[in-house]
């Protein structure tokens, strides 16, 4: 539904638009900064989608490349241990 002023009604949870963190800080995703990259990984070690991170498409692609490079350099794990594996 579009109103006369051209705005759209927000549906679902939250009404605030996420801002691309890298663009806001004026930096690029870097594979040598694993602490910053870990924030974009889920609990199982998978890369979070754009709708969860709020990154632009361009920065999401650069983030993916940086995470994959960090994984190959052994700075980040490929997968996180699951809860059942931790008991052993």
Swiss-Prot record:
The keyword Transport does not apply. Keywords: Ribonucleoprotein, Ribosomal protein, RNA-binding, rRNA-binding. One of its GO terms (molecular function) is small ribosomal subunit rRNA binding. GO terms for cellular component: cytosolic small ribosomal subunit. GO terms for biological process: translation. Gene3D superfamilies: Ribosomal protein S18 (4.10.640.10). InterPro entries: Ribosomal_bS18 (IPR001648), Ribosomal_bS18_CS (IPR018275), Ribosomal_bS18_sf (IPR036870). Binds as a heterodimer with protein bS6 to the central domain of the 16S rRNA, where it helps stabilize the platform of the 30S subunit. Part of the 30S ribosomal subunit. Forms a tight heterodimer with protein bS6. Belongs to the bacterial ribosomal protein bS18 family. This is Small ribosomal subunit protein bS18A. The gene is rpsR1.
